[in-house]
Design a protein with these regions (language model features):
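Acidic donor-binding loop of glycosyltransferase active sites
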Residues: 94-96, 252-267, 274-275
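Conserved nucleotide-sugar phosphate-binding/catalytic loop shared by glycosyltransferases and other
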Residues: 3-8, 26-76, 307-309
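An amphipathic, basic-hydrophobic alpha-helix
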Residues: 67-96
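Donor-nucleotide binding loops and adjacent catalytic segments primarily
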Residues: 40-51, 174-176, 183-256, 291-295, ...
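A short, well-ordered alpha-helix in the C-terminal region of glycosyltransferases
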Residues: 328-340
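C-terminal alpha-helical cap of glycosyltransferases
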Residues: 340-361
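Active-site-proximal region of nucleotide-activated glycan assembly enzymes
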Residues: 3, 31, 52-54, 113-175
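C-terminal "capping" alpha-helix adjacent to the active site of nucleotide-linked donor transferases
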Residues: 300, 304-307, 311-328
Length: 361
């Protein structure tokens, strides 16, 4: 049996793969624990959805690509985080560290390297983020979701593994989705997702044309924490800050989705053959990874993309109208998407590589 230290955080995308792997690891008799930040979204997700998994909070600092006085403060946080992670790893003595990226993962990877514990880094996006660019230098293996990512990373330690799809994704129950929302199967359902923190701009665009949109859809709106508009109470429109295990049931009744462009979410929509309008985070809020993702899937004919800089209630409505007009073509294009681009046995590969790395240590 193998003991795995999981890490990764900052966004849902940096946690969701770990959320699917940990229960499988435990069911197969392996041991698992989590190292994350003290206040990040990963702490809430892991402790609430996997209460049997020990969560170790460590100090962490944000990695910025621009000059800021905060960078100096965060250097000390990262150094403390390395010390925190070393204490945890020395106590738990895992066979392998599996990292999904995000700034909290860097101290863990560095601590593991100092203790000669092998690490595997998983990159979901088309191009590696800053945290993973640092982590790759100290990791034994890198797994990529996109085959094209291999152009940007060291070939000798990299494997294209495809997207990791949750086992329960296709097992959502429509009756539960309808019961939760109060909706009916007689009218299309639009799911709006603004990412881990929600999106004020997407929320505003949806609400400005709500009456018009409700003529075509029933709408499930995942607004983000603290962004539910309590003054809006209309039939066919439900709001949630965030959903957890209910998401599979909501996806089971979804006809069309408006979403940010995190790779994990896109692959899930693609697996379920849900036509999607992708509104990636702009360059003012990110390094452009979601823009790359959205352009990639749009080029494949799987989605349509709306640049956030062009987002308004009018452009959103127009983009959705065009998407609906061509929805059957998008679904047909998605049928060409094969299971070879997804992976259901990632845990087995992690275990296999962990044993090989242990032998080769």
């Amino acid at each position: 049996m193998v003991k795995i230290a999981f890490t990764g955080g900052g966004t849902v995308g940096h946690v969701s793969v770990n959320l699917s792997l940990i229960p499988t690891a435990l069911e197969k008799g392996h041991e698992a624990f989590y190292i994350g930040s003290k206040q990040g979204i990963e702490r809430e997700m892991i402790t609430s959805q996997l209460p049997e998994t020990t969560y170790y909070p460590i100090s962490s600092g944000k990695l910025r690509r621009y000059l800021s006085v905060e960078n100096l403060k965060d250097v000390f946080k990262v150094v403390k985080g390395i010390g925190d992670a070393r204490k945890v790893l020395k106590r738990e003595r895992p066979d392998i560290v599996f990292s999904k990226g995000g700034f909290v993962s860097v101290p863990v990877i560095l601590a593991a390297k100092s203790l000669n514990i092998p690490t595997i880094v998983h990159e979901s996006d088309l191009t590696p983020g800053l945290a993973n660019k640092i982590a790759i230098k100290f990791a034994k293996r890198l797994y990529t979701t996109f085959e094209d990512t291999l152009k940007y990373v060291p070939h000798e330690k990299s494997d294209f593994v495809g997207a990791t799809i949750r086992e329960d994704l296709k097992h959502g129950h429509q009756q539960n989705g309808y019961a939760l929302t109060g909706f009916t199967p007689n009218k299309k359902i639009l799911l709006v997702m603004g990412g881990s923190m929600g999106s004020l701009k997407i929320n505003e665009a949806i609400r400005r044309h709500l009456d018009e949109l409700l003529q075509t859809y029933q709408i499930i709106h995942l607004t983000g924490k603290g962004l539910v508009a309590s003054n809006i109470n209309q039939d066919g429109y439900v709001q949630y800050e965030f959903v957890k295990e209910e998401l599979t049931d909501l996806l089971a009744i979804t006809d069309t989705v408006v979403s940010r462009a995190g790779a994990n979410a896109i692959y899930e929509f693609l697996t379920l053959r849900i036509p999607m309008l992708l509104i990636p985070l702009g360059l003012d809020q990110s390094r452009g990874d979601q823009i790359d993702n959205a352009k990639y899937f749009e080029k494949q004919g799987y989605a349509t993309m709306l640049d956030e800089s062009e987002l308004s209630s009018d452009t959103l409505l127009l983009a959705l109208t065009e998407l609906e007009k061509n929805r059957h073509q998008y679904i047909q294009n998605m049928e060409s998407f094969t299971e070879s681009y997804t992976r259901h046995d990632l845990l087995e590969k992690i275990i296999q590589d962990a044993l090989q790395l242990e032998v080769g240590a």
